[in-house]
Amino acid sequence: MAAVVEVILAVMVVFLWPLTSVASSNVSSTLQCDKTNKRLATETISTPQATLKLACPSSTTFLPTYTGDAGTQTVYLTQDGSSTEKLQTALPGATAKQEDSQTNEMTLTFPQLPDTSQTVYFHCLGTENIAGQGSRKEVCGFAVTLTAPPPQGPQACVVPGTTIRLGIANEGDTTRFTCGGDLKLSPTAADKVFKEDCSTEESLKDLKRSEDKNSYFVLTATKTPSKTTHCYLCEPDPTKKGHNDKNCAVLIAVGAGSRPTARSVFGVAAPCILALLHFT
């Protein structure tokens, strides 16, 4: 019943928000809902392993409701809240956490960027009393956009069963990625790589693999590489209790004219397009 009420409230509040935009790379801050001006506070995240805290005013209700389980937590796919999706379906690997049930704050983590840019929305819903006019619904909210990584990265391979795609075209080009969580890179030898089938090991040619100070693996083209696709696997540690048997795959298209093919492993529901009415 609570879920039905939530949907009804979200659909009732249909509006055009002015925007308060903030562009970030690896966020670790709090985004405040602008209740006074009823603005949509926005954040753009362009690097993996980012953290963002969303704070609704104390007099409002955070929507979608916090479930306490990242697997069931939902988000809005449209600004008006008419379309919803599970958080981890829209943004693989993302988590949501509420430190205190008495606060209207939610902390989001985004370990891995999506294959295609994705925006999710949250609302802060309350009631405003107007002298002589009764009350009306008031709302502010958040729009959080995760951008798809460019061919050169950086990107993180974190979610078992998914694939990230990067690219190197010419001499001197680089691409950066890391294995997140407890996942370990395979092949381990710096001069080895898998073919596109992700199972046949071969020597790494025309490319050099190194590691930067942030524990990202860096592939650099020492000369213009032949056109092909390389694969690395981020594998779970079999000694870890309860480990996932699935790998996260890193496909790297190399050679002049190569472009990584964007393909989402998880289906993302397409937002329905509805007419937006002014909120008054």
UniProtKB/Swiss-Prot annotation:
Residues 257-280 form a propeptide. A lipid is attached at A256 (GPI-anchor amidated alanine). Glycans are attached at N26. Residues 1-23 form the signal peptide. It is found in: Cell membrane. GO terms for cellular component: plasma membrane; side of membrane. The N-terminus is blocked. Coiled coil: none annotated. InterPro entries: SRS_dom, SRS_dom_sf. SUPFAM superfamilies: Major surface antigen p30, SAG1 (SSF74877). Keywords: Cell membrane, Glycoprotein, GPI-anchor, Lipoprotein, Membrane, Signal. It is a lipid-anchor; GPI-anchor. It comes from the Eukaryota. This is Merozoite 31 kDa surface antigen. It comes from Sarcocystis muris. The lineage of its organism: Eukaryota, Sar, Alveolata, Apicomplexa, Conoidasida.
